[in-house]
């Protein structure tokens, strides 16, 4: 058992540290070009040149980097990627022909080269606008095994340059899958790559939640025959159990703290309780009657949305964490569950069953206005979770016959599968990497 715990700890340390690649600035960014794209604007047309390289190993690195950068930028939904025209370079001096960038409809140009220094890949990238003004020039380096992370580091820098946000690069998604025959917890990169199994309970593991700082992971486990909540320190592997009599389900971490909220029933009703990371109960939060589950927090941790049956069928309510005052948020739909509070703090996602029996994902402003249906006519769509930057949503859907994970933009556009994996996947939770 000790060997298993140690292996899990080492694996998690490796996973959460993988994307932190050292890089050096080659030149400063041009400040006035930060956040040139506003939300809701059309895609930015990027002429993306192939990475140049000399030597067999460097050309191999260049091909790998090109794939990573193309896929990474395309995944965001922010860009219209254009191949570099044949006349991109001036014949005499080999410089860039900026007129050709505009001629193919490009807004900006991105390209660079990879060299080898002390056996390590060194990627030098440049970004220009169509007039030839330099927007970014940076050098990235790391081990050969970190080529994917090197390419994604550039993608993150480009997105931040143009939008002011870091986007989803470097984030991870935890979820439940049954490809082994049992429901276990898995983790993958933001784009579905590098899937790793985190639990091996050979039973049922559900509702994974990673703490806001990436230190802990909590989940519900049925190995003992009843639902127990486990909290694990990812770095050390230390694990504690919240082993209370009765129900112990649906954990959610409170931002800015090492505490989480979960549903317990050891005092009678199924209510929400504040739990410390060591597994001890700090206090009871809800006493409204009925069943209270599925908590989610505002970014500052001052308010909590949750599902309650206190007024009949399950609906979304919001509670002030200081005063304890509770108000109902949702009134449309006969069965509203699985809320997820946006990182911007202004919206809440949730799953809603309509009278037709179909389950779809909706977005609503925290004041109850602005109800927007994001999915329709494509099976049951559930378990929405915001990306840490608020630009995307991961969810589960049966549109292809079995439960699989999908992603979409925050406005519901560009819905597509996240990963190709045997069995079914559900209950995704998008998280940061420590």
UniProtKB/Swiss-Prot annotation:
- Signal peptide position in this chain? 1-27
Q: Which GO terms describe its cellular component?
A: periplasmic space
UniProt-annotated location(s) = Periplasm
Read off the Pfam families from this record: PD40
Q: Which GO terms describe its biological process?
A: protein import
Major subcellular site: periplasm
Give the UniProt keywords, A-Z.
Answer: Periplasm, Signal
What the entry lists under Gene3D superfamilies is as follows: Dipeptidylpeptidase IV, N-terminal domain, TolB, C-terminal domain, TolB, N-terminal domain
Region Disordered: list its residue ranges.
Answer: 413-434
**Family assignment from sequence similarity:** Belongs to the TolB family.
Q: State the protein's name.
A: Protein TolB homolog
Q: What is the lineage of its organism?
A: Bacteria, Pseudomonadati, Chlorobiota, Chlorobiia, Chlorobiales
